[in-house]
Amino acid sequence: MPELAFPETGEVKTITTDCECSTDFVERSEKDILIAELNNKPSATLADYEESEPGPVVSKRKEKVVDLERKYEKLEERLFSFKNIASNDSLVAFYTRFPNYQTVMALYDFLNPGEHGENINYWLSGKNVDSTPKSMKQERPMTLKPVDEFFLTLCRLRQGFAEVHLAHLFNISQPTVSRIFISWVNFMYLKLGHIDIWPSRELTNATMPEDFKAKYATIRVIIDCTEVRCEMPSSLLLNSELFSSYKHHTTLKALVGISPKAFFTFIGQLYTDGISDREILERSGFLNLPFSNGDSVMADKGFTIEDILLLGVSLNIPPFLGMSDQMSAEDVIATQEIASLRIHVERATNKVKKFRIFDGVIPFSLFGIVNQMWSVVQYTGPHNQCLNCIIFEFNDGII
């Protein structure tokens, strides 16, 4: 019990009080308490506040909140995000190489990363975040929305932006950019890799251009090797394996195949440039493709592979000079015809290099996902027939 002292008399008395503690205060919301403090009414409730006229302090604070919300909306509009460029087709094409917002979203919906990116195995410092329980994974803090992570990935592939530049654009850290890019490239590679891009003989015939029908109607695929430049290693041994005398630079080399209609139908992995055309064809899995009897393959002179092609599959390459001093008129015509048709595969690979990440020098930091990137840019290019079908389906026949 509390005691009260009286100095004048020297008495000390014990004071008893009967009071009942109310829980009303505990049950009030934080908003009730704040309003009560602002109006100097300790017992005020939200209902009391709503019935009364707001005080000048409350009015000022309300005005400040409204002003801050307006400023926030304006700042959000100035952020670099896919939402803020979606209505501008030229910007969408510049950053993603897709013609419009609908096309990008058709691919995004096909990939289906999940509302919060829960379908993606996020990479982090060499460890896969998928080892984390799914409940924890779904609650991870998202720096960017999944659609903006997708946009960031397309920006880097299309324009070849450096990580530090993307970090500045999206207002995130450079390691976060790296984590997002690696995760999304692997995710896209796995999803798109399930698409069968090898067309049937019937589809090849149905889409055969007139240029081929006269003399090369049996062509199933046109193959060629292409190179992309990579960072020069400090190791002399590795440097010698990567160096290309043709490009005068260290390069990686891949086998690609297109249909007569100029769609990619085979995407090989990247190898060191020291590998021969014959060896890269044997190691790439090209010989395991389901050819039909009577098919033919068109290639350059370097592909002396007729002896290793499947039974019933022939090879169309420019004729060799042999022991003669000059070619016959027939051989010259055949060389010119094949060269004029093979130009389509060179044009297709040049379109891939319009994704500027492959137009420049591939850094060592991306060697771990270079094959995934190589496949993704070919699957997502406008020259890919299967991607066009995906876009057509998800756009309800718009394209």
What are these regions (language model features)?
Residues 1, 64, 100-103, 148, ...:
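Alpha-helical interaction elements in eukaryotic regulators
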Residues 2-3, 159-399:
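Short, well-ordered secondary-structure "scaffold" segments embedded in the functional core
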Residues 2-144:
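Charged, often Cys/His-bearing segments associated with DNA-binding zinc-finger transcription factors
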Residues 24-27, 57-60, 66-67, 74, ...:
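General helical secondary-structure elements
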Residues 78-79, 137-139, 148-151, 235, ...:
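Short, flexible segments with low predicted structural confidence
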Residues 145-160:
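Short, amphipathic alpha-helical "recognition" segments used to contact nucleic acids or chromatin
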